[in-house]
A protein has these predicted regions:
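Conserved donor-binding/catalytic core segment of Leloir-type glycosyltransferases
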Residues: 189, 229-258, 270
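Nucleotide-activated donor-binding/catalytic signature segment of Leloir-type glycosyltransferases, i.e.
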Residues: 279-298
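Aromatic "clamp/platform" in nucleotide-sugar-dependent glycosyltransferases that forms part
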Residues: 318
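Short hydrophobic beta-strand element within catalytic cores of glycosyltransferases
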Residues: 335-338
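Conserved acidic donor-binding segment of nucleotide-sugar-dependent glycosyltransferases
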Residues: 350-351, 355-362, 371-376
């Protein structure tokens, strides 16, 4: 039976060459939908001379791959750097471009908005952003379903940067904002049950759990050890991959490192990524000499090699939403030590494929890493169980569920 071809508009706050887990996920989604024969219209941030020059030179998959499909079209909306993070974009206000006009010309069956909150301006406390919920005006005028695809736990970011006292004051009004914002969409998809429960308590309307945040389990695989970036270095390796930002708690890895090294003297911490804290992290790492390597960004087979080579993948962030790199490490056969936070318990099962540490507790985090590295039998067992534990989140399996839900939403809208 031939599947019906859908016309799908995807509006995203981040896309290649801007580097983030969101951008990677959006491109994978676009590619999979194109491969199924759907018509995809991607509305993405433009890259311009306001951004650091190295962004344009990143060897990441993006438009060039999508443009090879005849069923693909795109529009780059005007953007500017995020106030406190110049390597990520924010859309210009709707006075400068019109999502309703773009969508009306394409005539989609359904619209997906990836990172809707960020595009609205939540990251910049509304000093930047589109000025209204993206896609909401088109939805009101046409009745075409518009879906918000949740990626970033903005509430966790607010708590992290403002602290508990100010955050608790904001809790009086946050549910009002979240309720009003979520009502602009037919449904908000959450890839984490814990995140969905958290936002439902904050009055998020029409929320729905859908395991759409998959990874390519064929690409991320233990056999990628053949791409080991440092094959002559036989020290036990703990690996972090991600943006080097405050909310990722990268500094806490440097707090935990000497505690780990006291028990595992030849341990090697490798930090892969870039971000605003680059200089600070490099400065702090100097005291540990060759014990810590700040690798910078990594792409392609080199990155695959890092995931497969690592003995333990570490993630101290308390702001993750079903973290992609956690899953990529597990698919590569590498146990994960993360902290207790919404969604991490859905990825890491203590004693099965890794351990969960107390948040913001470098000593407990170090002890969890040490427990793995000083016990070869335990490490082997965790590594053996890591990949099977995450196969249900293979990209194709997740996208088939996602596609099925899109069909349901389109069919329901046509009956109205």
């Amino acid at each position: 039976m031939t599947k019906q071809t859908l016309r799908i508009a995807i509006i995203t706050g981040v896309y290649a060459p801007f580097l983030s887990g969101v951008g990677v996920a959006v491109h994978q989604r676009v590619r999979w939908l194109l491969q199924q024969g759907h018509e995809v219209f991607l509305i993405h941030p433009e890259i311009n001379d306001k951004y650091p020059k190295d962004i344009c030179e990143r060897p990441v998959l993006g438009l060039a791959e999508a443009q090879a499909f005849p069923n693909f079209s795109s529009y780059a909306y005007p953007s500017q750097p995020l106030l406190l993070y110049k390597s990520l974009p924010e859309p210009l206000h709707y006075r400068y471009w019109n999502d309703t006009e773009l969508l009306s010309k394409f005539q989609p069956d359904i619209v997906l908005v990836e990172e809707a909150g960020a595009m609205r301006g939540f990251y910049s406390l509304f000093l930047q952003g589109y000025g209204r919920p993206v896609g909401s005006d088109f939805r009101k005028r046409t009745g075409i379903p518009v879906v918000s695809v949740f990626h970033t736990d903005i509430v966790a970011y607010i708590r992290y940067y403002l602290g508990n006292y100010l955050f608790n004051l904001l809790l009086l009004i946050l549910p009002i904002f979240i309720k009003q914002f979520s009502e602009a969409y037919d449904v908000t998809f959450f890839s984490s049950l814990e995140q969905q429960a958290k936002y439902k308590k904050l009055k998020c309307q029409r929320s729905e759990y859908l395991p759409y945040q998959g990874i390519d389990c064929e690409r991320f695989h233990p056999r990628n050890i053949c791409y080991d970036p440092i094959p002559d270095d036989h020290r036990p390796t703990i690996l972090f991959v991600g943006r080097v930002t405050a909310e990722k708690n990268v500094n806490q890895l440097l707090d935990a490192y000497p505690l780990i090294a006291a028990k595992i003297p030849d341990v090697h911490l490798v930090i892969v990524g870039s971000g605003p804290l680059d200089k600070e992290i490099r400065r702090r790492a100097q005291k540990f000499k060759s014990g810590i390597t700040i690798w910078g960004e990594s792409h392609g087979t080199e990155l695959l090699g890092w995931f497969a080579r690592a003995d333990v993948f570490v993630n101290p962030s308390v702001t993750e939403n079903f973290c992609t790199t956690n899953n990529e490490a597990l698919a590569s056969g590498t146990p994960v030590v993360a902290v207790v936070a919404p969604s991490t318990a859905e990825q890491v099962s203590p004693g099965l494929n890794g351990f969960l540490a107390e948040p913001n507790n470098p000593k407990d985090f170090a002890q969890k890493v040490i427990a793995i590295l000083e016990n070869p039998h335990l490490k082997a067992e965790l590594s053996h169980r890591a990949r099977p534990s995450i196969l249900e989140f293979d990209w194709s399996a997740c996208m088939q569920k996602f596609e099925h839900r899109l069909y349901q939403l389109v069919e329901a809208s046509r009956k109205c």
